[in-house]
C-alpha cells in the first residue's frame, strides 16, 4: 500500500534534501579510520566501517551525521575514484588472487583476476598493472580489479626500473626502425670537415648532439660555430620513426640507463657526432664581441663536419685548471679548448650583467653493479668544461629564438613568465618584511624580475629566495615567442639536442625552411601539450627510480650513528624535508624528532621555519647534521633525525 504513495515519496525527497552533505577527498590513516577533507580548513571524521566503502584519494559526496555534537561522514556517492589504472604486488595464487597497490597509504589487498587475453599465470610476489573494475559506491559489493599486464617477478633486481616505467605507462626500450638513407632535402651543405670541431661530453656519452669550433678574427672578436646532429636529414616528417619520436617527445634518462627517443642506430651512431666520422649537421655561426655580446649577423646553414676529438668534461676541466696528466692530442685541439674557454668567460660575464645565471648545483650519479645494486652515489660538480658547453648552447638557442621569431614568427619556445601576476602584491609584501622593497608592477617585467633575482643572489643565504619560489609560475613550451624570465632572456628556443628532444627536431625543420627561404606551417598546439606531459612523466619516473635506489643505498645506515650533512628544503606541519648534501637523497624528519613537547613546537610552512618555545631553531636552507632513523623499503621513504 505504501509502494506508490506520492506523499511518502515526497517525504523521502524532503528528508534527502534536508540532510547535510559535503563533497571532498578521502584521506586514509594507518589506524583504519579516515577523514573527508572538504578544504584546507574543514574535514569530517569517517569511522572505520564506512572507510571500507572508499579508498584514500577518492573524491566523494558524503552525508554528514551529528551525534552528541560529533560530526561524522557517511560516504554516499563517488565523484572521482583515486585508483583507475595502477601498479601493485600480487598476493595468493591460482583462482584466489589479490593485489596490493604500490602506494604509501593503500595497504588493503584488492581481489583481482587476470584480464581476458593476459597469458601470464600470476603468482605471489609478481608485479602487475591493474585496472579497477568495481567500487562499493558504484553499487558493487566490494572493490575488484583486473590484472592487465605482467611487469616482472618479485626478486628481479631491476624491479625499480620496470615497475616505475609501467606505473607511468612509459616505453621500456628503444623504438624499432631503421633509416637506410639520407633524405634529399634540397639543402646545400657547406663542407667543414677540415675544421677542428670537438665534442665535450661525459666520458660515457654515445649520443653526441653538439660539436664546437671557435676562431679568432683579425679584429680580436671571436667567431663560434655550433654544429648540431641532424636527425631530420634521416627522418621524414610524418614517417613511422617521426611519429614514434613525437609520442616519446624526449629521451628518458633514468639512473643507470636511458630509453632513447630515436632508434639507437640513429641516436648513438648515424646521427651522433663521433670523432673522425663525417656527419651531416645543422650549424649556426655567430660573432661574439669582447664584452660577450652576440652580433646581429647570425648565420644558420646546413653543413658536413668531422669531429676531430671526443673530449670528456673532467679531462678538459683538469687541463684548464692545470691539474692531472691528460693532454689534448695536438696543438689544434689545445687551441680550440683555449678559445672556447675565452668565449665561455665573456658570455658568462654578459649573462651576469644582462640576463641571469643559475647557481651551480651538483649532478648526482648512481654507480650501479651488474644486478642494479647501488655501489656508490657520486656528486659531480658542474666544472668549467660543463660551463663551456652550457654557454655555447645557450648562445646557440638564443640565436635560434631570434631567427625563428624574426623570420617566421613562431617556433618551439621555452617560455617562463616569472611571477604569477595574482601573486605580485603578496610577493612585494613578503619581501618588504625582509627589508627588500620592490614595485609589484615592475617585478612582473623581465627587467624587474632580473633586478630582483640579482638582489636575491647577493643575499648572505638562500632563505628569502626559497620563500618566494611559491609565487613563481612554471616554465611552459609554446609555439609563440615569449620571454624566459628564469634565464633573463627575451626569447629562448632550443635546437641543440634533436637526438633527445622532439621539439628540437621541429625547430630544425623550421630553421631549414628559413635557410631555403620556404614557407612552413606553424607547429600544432597539441605537440606542445604532449611534450609538456611527457616531460612531467619522465621527471616523475626519474624521481621514483631515484627514491628506490636511495632507499637501497641507505638501508644499511638506518639505526646507525653515521652522520650526514643535510640541507632543509621544506617545512610542513608534520616535520621537515631535507636533502643529503653528499648524495642528493631526500629524507623526512618527523616533528616529534625535532622536539618532544608538541605544544612548544611550531612548524610553519608559510614562514619556512621551525620554532621551539618561540625561538627559530631551524629554517629552510639551513644545513644540519642528521642520522638515518629508518628506511621503509615498501614506500621507499627515508626517515632521519637531527644528530645528537
Swiss-Prot record:
Span of domain RNB: 189-516
UniProt subcellular location: Cytoplasm
GO cellular component, one term: cytosol
The keyword Nuclease is assigned to this record: yes
Annotated ranges, domain S1 motif: 561-643
Domain of life: Bacteria
Main location: cytoplasm
Family matches, as PROSITE patterns: RIBONUCLEASE_II (PS01175)
Nuclease found in the keyword field: yes
Enzyme class name: hydrolase
InterPro entries linked: CSD (IPR011129), NA-bd_OB-fold (IPR012340), RNase_B_OB_dom (IPR013223), RNase_II (IPR011804), RNase_II/R (IPR001900), RNase_II/R_CS (IPR022966), RNase_II/RNase_R (IPR004476), RNR_Ribonuclease (IPR050180)
Annotated keywords: Cytoplasm, Exonuclease, Hydrolase, Nuclease, RNA-binding
UniProt family annotation: Belongs to the RNR ribonuclease family. RNase II subfamily.
Function comment: Involved in mRNA degradation. Hydrolyzes single-stranded polyribonucleotides processively in the 3' to 5' direction.
Name of this protein: Exoribonuclease 2
Organism: Salmonella gallinarum (strain 287/91 / NCTC 13346)
Source organism phylogeny: Bacteria, Pseudomonadati, Pseudomonadota, Gammaproteobacteria, Enterobacterales
Gene that encodes it: rnb
Amino acid at each position: 500500500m505504501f509502494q506508490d504513495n506520492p506523499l511518502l515519496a515526497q517525504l523521502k525527497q524532503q528528508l534527502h534534501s534536508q540532510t547535510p552533505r559535503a563533497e571532498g577527498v578521502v584521506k586514509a590513516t594507518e589506524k583504519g579510520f579516515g577523514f573527508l577533507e572538504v578544504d584546507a580548513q574543514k574535514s569530517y571524521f569517517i569511522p572505520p566501517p564506512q572507510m571500507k566503502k572508499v579508498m584514500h584519494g577518492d573524491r566523494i559526496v558524503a552525508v554528514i551525521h551529528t551525534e552528541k555534537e560529533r560530526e561524522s561522514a557517511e560516504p554516499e556517492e563517488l565523484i572521482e575514484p583515486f585508483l583507475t589504472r595502477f601498479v601493485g604486488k600480487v598476493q595468493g595464487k591460482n583462482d584466489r588472487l589479490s593485489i596490493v597497490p604500490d602506494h604509501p597509504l593503500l595497504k588493503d589487498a584488492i581481489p583481482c583476476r587476470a584480464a581476458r587475453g593476459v597469458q601470464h599465470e600470476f603468482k605471489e610476489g609478481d608485479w602487475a598493472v591493474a585496472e579497477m573494475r568495481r567500487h562499493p559506491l558504484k553499487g558493487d559489493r566490494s572493490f575488484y580489479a583486473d590484472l592487465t599486464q605482467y611487469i616482472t617477478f618479485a626478486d628481479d633486481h631491476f624491479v625499480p626500473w620496470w615497475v616505475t616505467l609501467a606505473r607511468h605507462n612509459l616505453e621500456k626500450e628503444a623504438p624499432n626502425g631503421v633509416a637506410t638513407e639520407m633524405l634529399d632535402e634540397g639543402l646545400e651543405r657547406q663542407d667543414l670537415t677540415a675544421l677542428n670541431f670537438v665534442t665535450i661530453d661525459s666520458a660515457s656519452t654515445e649520443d653526441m648532439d653538439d660539436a664546437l669550433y671557435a676562431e679568432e678574427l683579425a679584429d680580436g672578436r671571436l667567431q663560434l660555430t655550433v654544429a648540431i646532429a641532424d636527425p631530420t636529414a634521416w627522418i621524414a616528417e610524418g614517417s613511422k620513426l617521426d611519429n614514434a619520436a613525437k609520442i616519446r617527445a624526449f629521451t628518458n634518462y633514468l639512473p643507470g640507463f636511458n630509453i632513447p627517443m630515436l632508434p639507437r642506430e640513429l641516436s648513438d651512431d648515424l646521427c651522433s657526432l663521433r670523432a673522425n666520422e663525417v656527419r651531416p649537421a645543422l650549424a649556426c655561426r655567430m660573432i661574439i664581441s669582447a664584452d660577450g655580446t652576440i652580433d646581429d649577423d647570425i648565420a644558420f646553414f646546413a653543413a658536413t663536419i668531422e669531429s676531430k676529438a671526443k673530449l670528456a668534461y673532467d679531462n678538459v676541466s683538469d687541463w684548464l685548471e692545470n691539474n692531472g696528466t691528460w693532454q689534448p692530442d695536438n696543438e689544434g685541439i689545445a687551441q680550440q679548448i683555449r678559445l672556447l674557454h675565452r668565449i665561455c668567460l665573456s658570455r658568462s660575464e654578459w649573462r651576469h650583467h644582462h640576463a641571469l645565471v643559475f647557481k651551480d648545483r651538483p649532478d648526482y650519479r648512481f654507480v650501479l653493479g651488474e644486478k642494479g645494486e647501488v655501489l656508490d652515489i657520486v656528486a659531480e660538480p658542474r666544472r668549467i668544461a660543463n660551463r663551456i658547453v652550457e654557454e655555447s648552447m645557450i648562445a646557440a638557442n638564443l640565436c635560434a629564438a631570434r631567427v625563428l621569431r624574426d623570420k617566421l614568427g613562431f617556433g618551439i619556445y621555452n617560455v617562463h613568465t616569472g611571477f604569477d601576476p595574482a601573486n605580485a602584491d603578496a610577493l612585494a609584501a613578503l619581501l618588504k618584511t625582509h627589508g627588500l622593497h620592490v614595485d609589484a608592477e615592475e617585478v612582473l617585467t623581465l627587467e624587474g624580475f632580473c633586478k630582483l633575482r640579482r638582489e636575491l643572489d647577493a643575499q648572505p643565504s638562500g632563505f628569502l629566495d626559497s620563500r618566494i619560489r611559491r609565487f613563481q609560475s612554471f616554465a611552459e613550451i609554446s609555439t609563440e615567442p615569449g620571454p624566459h624570465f628564469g634565464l633573463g632572456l627575451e626569447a629562448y628556443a632550443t635546437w641543440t639536442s634533436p637526438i633527445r628532444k622532439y621539439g628540437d627536431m621541429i625547430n630544425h625543420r623550421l630553421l631549414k625552411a628559413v635557410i631555403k627561404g620556404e614557407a612552413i606551417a606553424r607547429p600544432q598546439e597539441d605537440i606542445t601539450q604532449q611534450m609538456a606531459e611527457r616531460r612531467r612523466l619522465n621527471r616523475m619516473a626519474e624521481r621514483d627510480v631515484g627514491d628506490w635506489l636511495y632507499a637501497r643505498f641507505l638501508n644499511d645506515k638506518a639505526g646507525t650513528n653515521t652522520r650526514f650533512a643535510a640541507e632543509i628544503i621544506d617545512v610542513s606541519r608534520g616535520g621537515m624535508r631535507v636533502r643529503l648534501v653528499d648524495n642528493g637523497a631526500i629524507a623526512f624528519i618527523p616533528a616529534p624528532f625535532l622536539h618532544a613537547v608538541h605544544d612548544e613546537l611550531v612548524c610553519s610552512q608559510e614562514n619556512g621555519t621551525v620554532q621551539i618555545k618561540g625561538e627559530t631553531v631551524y629554517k629552510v636552507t639551513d644545513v644540519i647534521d642528521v642520522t638515518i632513523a629508518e628506511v621503509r623499503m615498501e614506500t621507499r621513504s627515508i626517515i632521519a633525525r637531527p644528530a645528537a
